[in-house]
């Protein structure tokens, strides 16, 4: 079984739209949305939830007022100022360090585990999909990414599937690190802007750190051809191949608004031909088909 992850380094490069297009081309695969902080693959996939589970991680202090003597030690020890003068814990400010629980002489502080979000196993018109939703201001998205990927692999094994297509999170932080470990290949989708090039460079270094084969695809290349050439030159210096250049096309946005892949909306145009060519090249290099 192979896993391909599509990442970008920054948001807005067209990563998810390209990933959805691959989903309509690939066969015998499971889908995984690892962008748990701001998941949007479901907007195109329109998944039908089969199983829903809570994601629990971290702890938040809660003061039992029946036991609390208001000695003030917890407020004194808390470095996050999460405990008010009325001895109530602000769940947003609380970092879950547990120092108040440890030092409370009356053992009046509970420390329950947090329910941070949900993860789902769903059916889509392109195959099974594992995705998640992280709650507002919740952390530990890296753990949720690892969980989603683990469940996607388990699901693919149960169904005898050969491929996992993963829509990765933007950036280079903890969620991206969690999404890169153990994958077979990375496709980096970038755009010809200063921030696009800069963030692509950072994510290229991250993929290199994990020793994961990576390729680059430049979306909307014709909006700034000079920058597209700079990106291609950088990729060459790093020994990476630029699979192709995708021209700017409003079809991407129009299909997304309709909740469709570009092949469902208008697959006969030049954009569809380019993406099909990219997918064939990826398939050959990964030895998928």
Sequence positions of predicted segments:
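Iron-sulfur cluster-binding cysteine motifs and their immediate structural context
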Residues: 73-90, 99-115
